[in-house]
């Protein structure tokens, strides 16, 4: 029971996969359901980013940027921007895992507890929206990019207008925060040491190997072997940091969708229901089961990738579970002794609904052009 509470999405995906097996008996054809390229890319990126985090690169960059801040708005803007831009390369999950605890530390040291909730909420929104800009920003983008055979330029082009709008909205939201003078020095930040040059070059090189596969310079087995061999030699403990539950969730949904596609009556009905309604379907389904499984489920019954991308990325706004990355921020805040979880949820819901309404309107306008 505790596992179900901890991993509700994986549990639901596993149940759906098992139930679908009663209608389509297990066979070697199941292997054709699995998108091994997406799984290999996710695994490799999670491993390499774990290495970059382990050597302290992100905290070092963050503390370097924060040194010399003179106002609360400047501080809030920098902390929010860190999540917005870093999520484009290291995923929304890793961005929040790295910078939300870092922000809590900084705000406590600066004596600004009143900024804790609005800043963390804005960081969460920033990571979810910033991550939609690139193929590797979040799992749903990586999957749809791979599954639909998009080029990196196509995906970036599709998402650029919404990304620019979200950046402007975040700037406006930060500007509405109460401003006052502060002083943050390098000493007060306890700035992390710069990562060693050899480790930095090693992990950045591996990150470039991943990007090479993303833009299809070489096949995924080549990338997977290089990452596996290099990390085994350098630091095999990084394999423990990989989110294997996320990978299993993908596998379960692949099996469920593959089986549904082999049942003509169900496949035909779902295609009819979803076709032409990918954007609202993505937004609404994300509110209930989160945007990664929503992307996997809906992708099996439509060829319209642009509205689907819009739907599952904008759909990351709204409820706490609309994007599982949002849960990361909430847990980090809720663990604080002085946490006001009720207030957090009120602010989170208010900010998210405002962003969701504006982004949905923008999405509709872009799709109707």
Language model feature labels by segment:
Residues 168-228:
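Long, contiguous bundles of hydrophobic transmembrane helices that form the permeation core
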Residues 156-167, 280-369:
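C-terminal transmembrane helix pair
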Residues 33, 55, 59-62, 205-303:
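Transmembrane helical segments that form the transport core of multi-pass membrane transport proteins
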Residues 1-13, 71-72, 194-202, 346:
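N-terminal membrane topogenic signal
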Residues 81, 85-129, 143, 296-310, ...:
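Hydrophobic transmembrane alpha-helices that form the pore/transport pathway of multi-pass ion
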Residues 36-38, 67-80, 109-119, 197-201, ...:
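Membrane-interfacial loop-to-helix junctions in multi-pass transporters
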Residues 23-34, 369:
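Short, hydrophobic transmembrane alpha-helix segments
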Residues 111-179, 185-188, 331-361:
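Membrane-core helix-loop-helix motifs of multi-pass transport proteins
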């Amino acid at each position: 029971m505790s596992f179900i509470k901890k991993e509700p999405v994986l549990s639901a995906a596993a149940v759906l996969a098992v139930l679908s097996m009663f209608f389509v008996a297990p066979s070697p054809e199941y292997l054709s359901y699995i998108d091994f390229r997406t799984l290999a890319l996710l695994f490799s990126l999670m491993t390499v980013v774990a290495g970059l985090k382990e050597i302290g690169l992100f905290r070092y960059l963050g503390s370097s940027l924060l040194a010399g801040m003179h106002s609360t708005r400047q501080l809030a803007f920098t902390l929010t921007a860190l999540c917005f831009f870093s999520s484009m390369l290291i995923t929304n999950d890793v961005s929040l895992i790295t910078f939300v605890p870092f922000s809590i530390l900084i705000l406590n040291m600066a004596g600004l507890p009143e900024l804790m909730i609005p800043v963390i909420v804005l960081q969460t929104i920033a990571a979810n929206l910033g991550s939609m800009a690139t193929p590797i920003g979040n799992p749903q983008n990586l999957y749809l990019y791979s599954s639909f055979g998009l080029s990196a330029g196509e995906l970036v082009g599709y998402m650029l207008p919404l990304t620019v709008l979200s950046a402007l909205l975040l700037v406006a939201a930060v500007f509405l925060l109460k401003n006052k003078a502060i002083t943050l020095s390098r000493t007060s930040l306890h700035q992390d040491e710069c990562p060693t040059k050899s480790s930095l070059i090693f992990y950045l090189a591996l990150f470039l190997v991943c990007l090479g596969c993303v833009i299809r310079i070489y096949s995924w087995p080549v990338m997977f072997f290089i990452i596996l061999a290099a990390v085994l030699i350098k630091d095999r403990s990084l394999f423990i940091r990989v989110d294997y539950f996320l990978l299993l969730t993908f596998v379960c949904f692949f099996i469920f969708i593959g089986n549904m596609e082999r049942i003509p009556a169900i496949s035909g009905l779902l295609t009819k229901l979803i076709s032409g309604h990918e954007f609202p379907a993505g937004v609404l389904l994300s509110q209930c089961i989160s945007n990664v499984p929503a992307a996997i489920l809906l992708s099996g019954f439509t060829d319209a990738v642009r509205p689907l991308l819009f739907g599952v990325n904008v759909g990351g706004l709204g409820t706490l579970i609309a994007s599982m990355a949002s849960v990361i921020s909430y847990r980090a805040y809720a663990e604080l002794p002085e946490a006001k979880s009720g207030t957090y949820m009120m602010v989170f819901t208010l900010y998210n609904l405002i962003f969701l309404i504006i982004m949905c309107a923008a999405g509709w306008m872009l799709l109707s052009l």
